[in-house]
């Protein structure tokens, strides 16, 4: 950490880019997070090849956290806190394989095709509301902070009349401005709602993710596993997509010559979305990997039990990844970025995220071809304390 920026090195950003000191840190380096009695030392990987090696090797690196000193690294475990049951990132194969296989019915190609018309409808509903409010308007408040939650509720199977309440509970138990007691109460209410919904789905499976899983696997997927996975889906999909929408629009407005990619064919839009995902990389890092044994990585001696943090934004700006990698180029052929992770923990919802972003950006410029920054000289307000990078406000005009 530095006096100028107290945040851990792996989450430092400057505008749309990773911080210079993060990019200059080296392929694999030691970092300290926290201070005093709370200080923890980790390895931090920034090179694309090293990040892929760590995330892709579940034999040597575990994602499962130990909550008991007797628990072997990456073992089946003797204790997992309730909040981590169903969180795929806290499971290693074969546990991970078993659970992920049961959850894939909610993310099939058929499921994504069924979701497409709804996503288009919710995006246009939000754009209608923004247009009615008049120019200028805050794109974050009207679109970026609204679309992802609505899409995720449809995916999971939350009844439409419950969705406003459901999202308030989801956001409330993460709100750092609330007391710990209040957040815990909201989190408990959120969990109880999910368990009640799962019980209903077991009696009469619907078309959402929970219904698809219980229809195919029944009691083989436990209530707690389904509850935990729903929490993971909501937390990962909401913040990440909100961040990508805001930053993506800002990036395109700063590079207006590239907006035509979303006015052309679907293949051009798909390529543009993939480049925006790589260039912006809103998640800072996945769950730290724990070395299962002594090993050598990028010339460094890693000890069994050492923690490795993988910086996804830095890895996706590694000059070894592609020529001119610091430049946004939506016509670039897709390159093997790690914004969705890598290996067995590659994001299960990657196809949904791409579909959602492609719909938002395509419909936005179809509806508002003259969209522009309301005040190009205004300082941009970035979210610095949320799990994924994003904007607090983006005033646009048309």
Curated annotation (Swiss-Prot):
Annotated pathway: Antibiotic biosynthesis; vancomycin biosynthesis
Needed cofactors: heme
UniProtKB keywords: Heme, Iron, Metal-binding, Monooxygenase, Oxidoreductase
Keyword Heme assigned: yes
Known role: Involved in the coupling of aromatic side chains of the heptapeptide of vancomycin.
GO terms assigned for molecular function: heme binding; iron ion binding; monooxygenase activity; oxidoreductase activity, acting on paired donors, with incorporation or reduction of molecular oxygen
E.C. no: 1.14.-.-
Superkingdom assignment: Bacteria
Family label: Belongs to the cytochrome P450 family.
Name of the protein in question: Cytochrome P450 165B3
GO biological process per UniProt: vancomycin biosynthetic process
């Amino acid at each position: 950490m530095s006096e100028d920026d107290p945040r851990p090195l792996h989450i430092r950003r400057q505008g749309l880019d990773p911080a210079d000191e993060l990019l200059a840190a080296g392929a694999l380096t030691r970092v300290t997070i926290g201070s005093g009695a709370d200080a923890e030392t980790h390895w931090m990987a920034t090179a694309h090849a090293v990040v892929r090696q760590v995330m892709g090797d579940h034999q040597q690196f575990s994602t499962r956290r130990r909550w008991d000193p007797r628990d072997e690294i990456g073992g089946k475990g003797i204790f997992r806190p309730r909040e981590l049951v169903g969180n795929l990132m806290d499971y290693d194969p074969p546990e991970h394989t078993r659970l992920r296989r049961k959850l894939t019915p909610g993310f099939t190609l058929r499921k994504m095709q069924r979701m497409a018309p709804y996503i288009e409808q919710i995006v246009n509903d939000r754009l209608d509301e923004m247009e009615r409010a008049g120019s200028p308007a805050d794109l974050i408040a009207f679109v970026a902070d609204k679309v992802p939650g609505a899409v995720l509720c449809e995916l999971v199977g939350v009844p439409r009349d419950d969705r406003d309440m459901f999202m308030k509970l989801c956001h409330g138990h993460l709100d750092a401005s609330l007391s710990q007691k209040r957040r815990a109460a909201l989190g408990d209410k959120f969990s109880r709602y999910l368990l009640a919904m799962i019980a209903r789905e077991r009696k009469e499976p619907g078309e959402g993710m929970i219904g698809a899983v219980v229809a195919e696997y029944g009691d083989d997927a436990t209530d707690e596993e389904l509850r935990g996975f729903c929490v993971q889906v909501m937390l990962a999909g909401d913040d990440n997509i909100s961040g990508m929408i805001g930053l993506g629009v800002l990036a395109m407005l700063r590079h207006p010559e590239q907006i035509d990619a979303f006015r052309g064919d679907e293949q051009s839009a798909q390529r543009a979305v993939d480049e925006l995902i790589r260039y912006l990389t809103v998640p800072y890092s996945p769950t730290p990997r724990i070395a299962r044994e002594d090993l050598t990585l990028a010339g460094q001696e890693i000890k069994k039990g050492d923690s490795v943090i993988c910086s996804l934004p830095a890895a996706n700006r590694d000059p070894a990844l592609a020529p001119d990698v610091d430049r946004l180029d939506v016509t670039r052929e897709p390159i093997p970025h790690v914004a969705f992770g890598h290996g067995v923990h590659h994001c299960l919802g990657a196809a949904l995220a791409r579909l959602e972003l492609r719909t938002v950006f395509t419909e936005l410029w179809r509806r508002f071809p003259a969209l522009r920054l309301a005040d190009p000289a205004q300082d941009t307000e970035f979210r610095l304390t949320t799990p994924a990078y994003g904007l607090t406000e983006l005033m646009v005009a048309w």
